[in-house]
Amino acid sequence: MALYWQVSGQGQDLVLVHGWGMNGAVWQQTAEALSAHFRVHVVDLPGYGHSAEQHAASLEEIAQALLENAPRNAIWVGWSLGGLVATHMTLHHPDYVSKLVTVASSPKFAAQGNWRGIQPDVLTAFTDQLVADFQLTIERFMALQAMGSPSARQDVKVLKQAVLSRPMPNPQSLLAGLTMLAEVDLRDELQHISVPMLRLYGRLDGLVPAKVARDLNHLAPYSEAFMFDQSSHAPFMTEAEAFCQQLIEFTTR
């Protein structure tokens, strides 16, 4: 059974990949704005939204599911966990990716030593909570994503509406996603990316600290980076117009 895709607009192919616990509906506003410039492809990842019947336990399993209907030579935009997916596609299925954009993402989400990120005990707590009450856990995660942003309440409302507008995620895939956030480390592989890369961050993000952006300036010196001052983990919602502008400028350079 194929993944659920929505395609709109005309022009160069651009793929939008959502994050953990969410689905493609989070991109609705972004897709509408970008479809004036691109042919926009929005996917529900395995286990999420209209692809909730599917399951993938690793980045490569997600990639294999995406390859069935993904356009070749496209711009890939990945938010949060979706950034790991888009980076994996760039590294392992390069025919499909012409440019890479990561949004509020990190090659390694879990904190370790000097590397900033989500504390492992927070991820463990999420895993435990997920088993007990996955709907409540997703709501907590939404609040965590929006925390710090001046429009936090509105952001959470939009995220919640997006998630609830489609079938609830598959708990097995939610657990697999948390394992990826806890264990995946692509830092050493970034040097092998040969396509143009843009990294977008929210200055107020509590999940991907601003320091990660600075560290990645050294790990991926060929890439470009931009920090949204008023955003936390969802700059495409908080600063929607500026977000689309950054994408358009990067892809037309």
For the regions a protein language model found, what residue spans apply to each?
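Conserved alpha/beta-hydrolase catalytic His-Asp/Glu region
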Residues: 131-184, 188-189
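Conserved HGGG/HGGXW glycine-rich cap/lid loop of the alpha/beta-hydrolase fold
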Residues: 4-53
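Short beta-strand/loop motif that positions the catalytic acidic residue
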Residues: 193, 199-201
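Active-site loop/oxyanion-hole signature of alpha/beta-hydrolase fold enzymes
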Residues: 28-32, 41-77, 245
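Acidic catalytic loop of the alpha/beta-hydrolase fold
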Residues: 204-208
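Flexible "cap/lid" loop of the alpha/beta hydrolase fold
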Residues: 91, 96-132
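Gly/Ala-rich beta-loop-alpha elbow adjacent to hydrolase catalytic centers
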Residues: 78-82, 86
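Catalytic histidine-centered segment of alpha/beta-hydrolase-like enzymes
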Residues: 231-244
